[in-house]
């Protein structure tokens, strides 16, 4: 570093020190600045003190308001939690004096996976609160201790008393041999104590639906929050995702539904201003859904008219639910909790499948045998349509050599219309309809689908064993893997595997019967047809073994039927019969689909010629 550089740095340092000394604030400025910051701190302290005072005042006001509201039932604000049980031969209900609510529901005749009676909910699984109103605000029943009075084995009154002459009663009564429990709210001596202008009570109801069955995935798929519009149809929230809905219409009932069991809350005077929510629970949590509902219903604070409601804690059994409407003018239609398919298929299941199933079950047969017999009966019913479909395919097959000749005659793409017209003419000459097998197939489809929809909802199959399957209502884990396979799970269902194999065989025989030829598009179609059963293996592996068993034997019967029909059909004789029809003058007259198709083809040909002539003139 040279002398000039050192001198420059020293001068810069002197300038910086001098500037700092000259620019420093005076003592008066320092004092003024200190007073400024002190004033800010004082203001902040005052604001914090005011905020704390305001919050304390609000909290105190809230407590005073709640205390003023609760002062009507001051004696009920303190107590000790106690439980009361009522029961009949089907269900056991435990009531909690804290809130006067239903604490648990146990079904005596249905066992869980632990071989103990099914408990729909217990303790903190569920909650229920009623908001009544006086001049000071809301009275929440969850904050009060009720007194159990007038108790019998099947009924009890939970009483919330202001004094000996003024109280609100929750009256619970179990009907004999029934899963239905009457629930009545009645005010006595509450004139002037409750807001006379408020003729409603607000209700909050929630329940975490337990996983009762072995298969979380399938049970979760059939568990949803369902509700019925007054005098109208039934609706539900999504079963596959979190869902919420505000319902402006009046409702008859709200149901928290599992696959085979439901908790239903019914209001004779209807629910209104309803909001329903459903949230998914994680697999392995022991629960499948978290349901909640907020609604209002009629309440007479004078006590002249009671609030009539009901609870149903029981199975989703079609005839059990249907019987609840017996003698009622306005039907609840709780049997809609049992899903039986689309309207036509539901009608078939309602009037035919269920009655035949019950008749077969009445013989004391194994449920596997009942399903086998039911499937055979269905196959017998649809056999005429099956035979007609087969014969239509057989006729098409024996005429295929003649169709091949027409294909060779018109190899060019521009001759496709002529080729199609000649093919249809050939079919018409032999009295064969290319659509002849479609209508019979469509007619038998609803019948076959009816049983497919019925089996998963049939609680009768629950915990019924057959062969290696210990429960026909859930999957049969013939092989269990120590890991999870995407789209398949951690197990392999043997009935599902058998169903897949028989479907591949059925596809093979069907493709042979149709004899689709070697066209590229037909080859691709063949692969698609073979791929479908393999896809079903992944889709249906979690489905009930009873359903896969039905699908397996149904397809197996179809394969056997196809083989028998193929071996008993003399195709040479069939061709001879078709040749005889060709010589019949009556067959020369084209009718039906063939005639309409030929007319359309001629019309298209004429339009094509007209367009060509116009272009030539130009």
Swiss-Prot record:
Q: Protein transport among the record's keywords?
A: yes
Question: One GO term of the cellular component aspect?
Answer: plasma membrane
Its placement in the membrane is given as:
Multi-pass membrane protein
Which molecular-function annotations from GO does this UniProt entry contain?
Answer: membrane insertase activity
Alphabetical keyword list: Cell membrane, Chaperone, Membrane, Protein transport, Transmembrane, Transmembrane helix, Transport
- Ranges that cross the membrane: 3-23, 363-383, 439-459, 478-498, 520-540, 545-565
- Could you tell me which Pfam families the record lists for this protein? 60KD_IMP, YidC_periplas
A GO biological process of this protein is: protein insertion into membrane
The similarity comment for this entry is: Belongs to the OXA1/ALB3/YidC family. Type 1 subfamily.
What interactions and quaternary structure are annotated? Answer: Interacts with the Sec translocase complex via SecD. Specifically interacts with transmembrane segments of nascent integral membrane proteins during membrane integration.
- What is this protein's function per UniProt? Required for the insertion and/or proper folding and/or complex formation of integral membrane proteins into the membrane. Involved in integration of membrane proteins that insert both dependently and independently of the Sec translocase complex, as well as at least some lipoproteins. Aids folding of multispanning membrane proteins.
This chain belongs to which protein, by name? Answer: Membrane protein insertase YidC
Q: What is the originating organism of this protein?
A: Bacteroides fragilis (strain YCH46)
In the record, what lineage is assigned to the organism producing the protein? Answer: Bacteria, Pseudomonadati, Bacteroidota, Bacteroidia, Bacteroidales
**What gene makes this protein?**
yidC
């Amino acid at each position: 570093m040279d002398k000039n550089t050192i001198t420059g740095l020293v001068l810069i340092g002197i300038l910086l020190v001098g500037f700092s000394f000259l620019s420093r604030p005076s003592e008066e400025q320092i004092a003024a600045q200190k007073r400024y910051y002190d004033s800010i701190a004082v203001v902040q302290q005052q604001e914090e003190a005011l905020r704390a005072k305001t919050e304390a005042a609000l909290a105190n006001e809230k407590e005073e308001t709640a205390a003023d509201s609760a002062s009507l039932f001051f004696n009920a604000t303190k107590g000790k939690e106690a439980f009361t049980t009522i029961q009949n031969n089907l269900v056991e209900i435990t009531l909690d004096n804290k809130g006067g609510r239903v604490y648990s529901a146990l079904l005596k005749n249905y066992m869980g996976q632990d071989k103990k009676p099914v408990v729909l909910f217990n303790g903190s699984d569920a909650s229920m609160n009623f908001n009544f109103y006086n001049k000071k605000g809301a009275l929440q029943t969850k904050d009060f201790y009720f007194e159990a009075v007038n108790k019998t084995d099947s009924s009890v009154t939970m009483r919330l008393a202001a004094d000996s002459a003024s109280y609100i009663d929750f009256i619970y009564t179990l009907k004999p041999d029934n899963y239905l429990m009457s629930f009545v709210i009645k005010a006595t001596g509450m004139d002037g104590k409750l807001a006379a202008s408020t003729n409603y009570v607000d209700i909050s109801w929630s329940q975490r639906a337990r996983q009762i069955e072995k298969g979380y995935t399938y049970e979760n798929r059939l568990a949803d929050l369902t509700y019925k519009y007054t005098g109208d149809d039934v609706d539900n929230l999504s079963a596959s995702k979190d869902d919420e809905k505000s319902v402006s219409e009046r409702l008859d009932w709200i149901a928290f539904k599992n696959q085979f069991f439901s908790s239903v809350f019914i209001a004779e005077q209807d629910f209104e201003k309803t909001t329903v929510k459903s949230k998914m629970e994680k697999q392995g949590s022991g629960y499948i859904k978290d349901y909640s509902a907020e609604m209002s219903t009629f309440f007479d604070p004078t006590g002249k008219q009671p609030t009539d409601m009901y609870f149903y804690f029981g199975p989703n059994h079609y005839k059990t639910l249907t019987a609840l409407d017996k003698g009622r003018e306005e039907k609840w239609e709780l049997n809609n909790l049992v899903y039986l398919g689309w309207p036509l298929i539901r009608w078939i299941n309602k009037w035919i499948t269920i009655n035949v199933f019950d008749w077969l079950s009445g013989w004391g047969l194994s449920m596997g045998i009942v399903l086998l017999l039911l499937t055979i009966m269905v196959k017998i019913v649809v056999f005429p349509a099956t035979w007609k479909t087969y014969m239509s395919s057989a006729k098409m097959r024996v005429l295929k050599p003649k169709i091949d000749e027409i294909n060779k005659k018109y190899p060019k793409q521009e001759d496709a219309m002529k080729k199609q017209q000649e093919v249809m003419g050939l079919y018409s000459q032999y009295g064969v309809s290319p659509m002849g097998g479609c209508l019979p197939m469509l007619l038998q489809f609803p019948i076959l689908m009816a049983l497919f929809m019925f089996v998963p909802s049939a609680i009768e199959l629950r915990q019924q064993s057959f062969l290696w399957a210990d429960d026909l209502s859930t999957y049969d884990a013939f092989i269990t893997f120590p890991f999870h396979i995407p789209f398949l799970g951690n197990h392999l269902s043997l009935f599902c595997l058998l169903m897949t194999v028989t479907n591949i065989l059925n596809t093979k025989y069907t493709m042979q019967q149709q004899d689709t030829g070697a066209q590229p598009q037909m080859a691709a179609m063949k692969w698609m047809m073979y791929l479908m059963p393999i896809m079903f293996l992944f889709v249906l592996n979690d489905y009930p073994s009873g359903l896969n068993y039905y699908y397996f034997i149904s397809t197996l019967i179809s394969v056997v039927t196809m083989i028998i029909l193929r071996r008993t059909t003399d195709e040479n004789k069939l061709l001879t019969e078709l040749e005889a029809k060709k010589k019949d003058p009556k067959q020369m007259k084209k009718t039906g689909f063939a005639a309409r198709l030929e007319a359309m083809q001629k019309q298209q040909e004429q339009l094509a010629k007209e367009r060509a002539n116009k272009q030539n003139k130009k």
